[in-house]
Amino acid sequence: VAQATLSCRYAAIHLVYLGIYTREEKMCLQGAVFLRNSIESVVSIERLPENVSFSTASGGMRSSRPTVNTVVLGGFMKICEQLHMIKGITAVIGSGGKTTLLRILAEELSGTVLLTTSTHILPFAGIPLLVTDDIEQVRRALALHRVICMGTPAAEGKLTAPALPFSVLADAADYVIVEADGSKRLPLKAHASHEPVIPENTRKTVCVVGASGFGKPIKQAVHRPELFYARTGAHMSGIVTPELAAQGIIAEHLADIVVLNQAETVSPEIAKRFTEALKSSGFTVVCTTLNHTLE
């Protein structure tokens, strides 16, 4: 239970699903929920949707039902494990939690981690910021701090791309995680022809989607709604459905894996509709709430 609770620190509050599992597994889940409820906030326990696999505390997959390429984070595996992070350059695109995902991955991953951007980003509180074109300074900073942020100072306190090429940075750090997109703080996005700005030699691209946009008018929830209309055939006065959001992602096909963030804002059935719409096109989907509480 203690291990489960520690692993819960960034995980979904809402998506702690109880399916058909052993008595021991249920007791572990219920104990973790009780402890988290006592320390932080109320945890909503829902039933595991059909055909969705569940990650146990041991890291194994346990389900008596068929599994699909959809993973629901219940707090027992790190997000970096669910995303199957690999060393090298990872680009994070989309909307509804990109920056929070970068911070969580930096804290979870073992090895040196360099956070940066190919567009613009705000510096991370508590993470050393390095502005340099000297790769040896980068190596020394990583050896000292393990996790650093790099970029070029720009207007409004933001950072733009670093002076050094991403491929050079990848030789210095185990993981280079790049925020490669902007979204105007909206939960959903359609990409223009010049977006996203994915670095050369990127090994994995993760697309973040904000579930809080489901059920809202497209023009209010989607960055570049005119492109969303064009790619999905949605009516200009329509609302965002899980199927339309998935259709937009499929049409663009920019990512290897999709993170449905803000999952506590929708029902399990809505989340399932989104994942089911994507899985037939070969996407892996992780449903979670990026609830970063440790600073």
Predicted regions and their residues:
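Short hydrophobic targeting helices and cationic amphipathic motifs
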Residues: 15-18, 29, 35-38, 55
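General beta-strand structural signal in soluble alpha/beta enzymes
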Residues: 92-93, 113-118, 149-152, 176-180, ...
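Walker A (P-loop) phosphate-binding motif
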Residues: 79-109
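Conserved catalytic-core segment of NTP-binding enzymes
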Residues: 157-170, 181-281, 293
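N-terminal phosphate/diphosphate-binding loop that engages ATP/GTP or pyrophosphate donors
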Residues: 106-153
